[in-house]
UniProtKB/Swiss-Prot annotation:
<protein>
    <recommendedName>
        <fullName>Protein SlyX homolog</fullName>
    </recommendedName>
</protein>
<dbReference type="Pfam" id="PF04102">
    <property type="entry name" value="SlyX"/>
</dbReference>
<comment type="similarity">
    <text>Belongs to the SlyX family.</text>
</comment>
<dbReference type="InterPro" id="IPR007236">
    <property type="entry name" value="SlyX"/>
</dbReference>
Amino acid sequence: MDAVQELERRIVELEIQSALQEDVIAGLNAMVAELRQTLDLQQAQLRLLYQKMQDRNPDAQEPYSLRDEIPPHY
């Protein structure tokens, strides 16, 4: 195999690696975007829950406890 053919083979291998890496990066980017949306939703839910807890007892000096809540079936 002469030097030109060896260089062509190496270039083809590098192009294949580059294409595979681009695919992996695109997949990871999509996953990060999905996780970001999930995190944003969870943060909004947490803020809403915190606000509801504050609205129930804004003057409370003690932290909120689930033990103070009586389930509806009792």
